[in-house]
């Protein structure tokens, strides 16, 4: 396998209407780092939480396809709301260096009850770059559900890309989960969070043994990673530090299934709604 270079753009974003800024920053990044193969942006980077027509996927995707082709880079320009069949989903497009849409990755778990009215997905998003390896994508709150990353790893993903939009006080918990995910799935974990008025930054890149490779602050920065995914396969074969081989164990004994879910207990937890004041 050959080496592959990725940049994560943690940008100082306005609440919405960031398209021109995003394009400018992509252009600047390619000039400064001409050896890059892929650029990734944060969740909803262009339009933020707005669901206005101008920020929807269909009204933005062609421009980013043209940009990816022009700059000869793979591009995940964050995510966009996508209106289809009377539903709205949160979708991260994967665009090849030829300008082709390789995948539309839909967020499995919208951030309910805050991301109200957004439909979920039960499909995993995985794609292959020939000669490089297998990539998985899940979006923001999907990180909180280890089943999503396990599903990606069990389909062969050697790196998980994670566009995120977090501006809340639980960012430290998310960074802990990013490390745990990399360890449990024995893969690279590439998290890009929003900055500026959208998010609190602190993007993190983790290696397949849980080692923190890059951790950004809260200001505008670029996270860089150069990978050879043969390392992931070696660790999965031999174990982390020559010890645990969790993917093999799960392969041989996949204990998690719907028959073992206590539905009565889960129902007793109540509706998925905004918390009320404690009495």
Listing of model-derived features with the role each one plays in the protein:
Residues 5, 34-35, 134, 156:
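Short loop/turn motifs at secondary-structure junctions
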Residues 12, 45, 80-81, 110, ...:
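Catalytic metal-binding/acid-base residues of hydrolase active sites
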Residues 57-75, 144-223:
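CN hydrolase (nitrilase-like) catalytic-core segments centered on the catalytic cysteine
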Residues 83-158, 168-176, 180, 240:
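Active-site catalytic loop in hydrolytic enzyme cores
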Residues 126, 194-279:
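C-terminal beta-strand edge segments of enzyme domains
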């Amino acid at each position: 396998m050959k080496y592959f270079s990725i940049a994560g753009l943690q940008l100082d974003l306005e609440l919405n209407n960031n398209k021109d800024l995003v394009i400018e920053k992509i252009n600047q990044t390619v000039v400064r780092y001409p050896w890059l193969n892929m650029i990734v942006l944060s969740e909803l980077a262009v339009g933020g939480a707005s669901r206005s027509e101008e920020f929807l996927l269909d009204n933005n995707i062609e421009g980013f396809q043209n940009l990816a082709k022009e700059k000869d880079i793979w591009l995940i320009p964050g995510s966009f709301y996508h209106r289809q069949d009377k539903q709205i989903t949160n979708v991260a497009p994967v665009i090849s260096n030829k300008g082709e849409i390789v995948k539309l990755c839909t967020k499995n778990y919208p951030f309910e009850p805050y991301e109200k009215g957004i439909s979920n997905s039960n499909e995993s998003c995985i794609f292959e770059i020939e000669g490089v390896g297998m990539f998985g994508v899940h979006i923001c709150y999907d990180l909180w559900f280890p089943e999503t990353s396990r599903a990606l790893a069990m389909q062969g993903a050697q790196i998980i890309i994670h566009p995120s939009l977090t501006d809340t006080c639980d960012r430290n918990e998310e960074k802990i989960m990013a490390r745990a995910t990399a360890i449990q799935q024995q893969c690279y974990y590439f998290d890009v969070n929003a900055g500026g008025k959208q998010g609190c930054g602190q993007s993190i890149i983790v290696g397949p043994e849980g080692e923190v490779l890059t951790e950004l602050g809260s200001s505008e920065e670029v996270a860089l990673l150069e990978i050879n995914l043969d390392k992931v396969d070696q660790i999965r074969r031999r174990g982390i530090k020559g010890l645990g081989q969790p993917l093999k164990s799960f392969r041989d004994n996949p204990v998690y299934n719907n028959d073992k879910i206590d539905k009565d207990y889960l129902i007793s937890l109540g509706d998925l709604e905004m918390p009320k004041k404690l009495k």
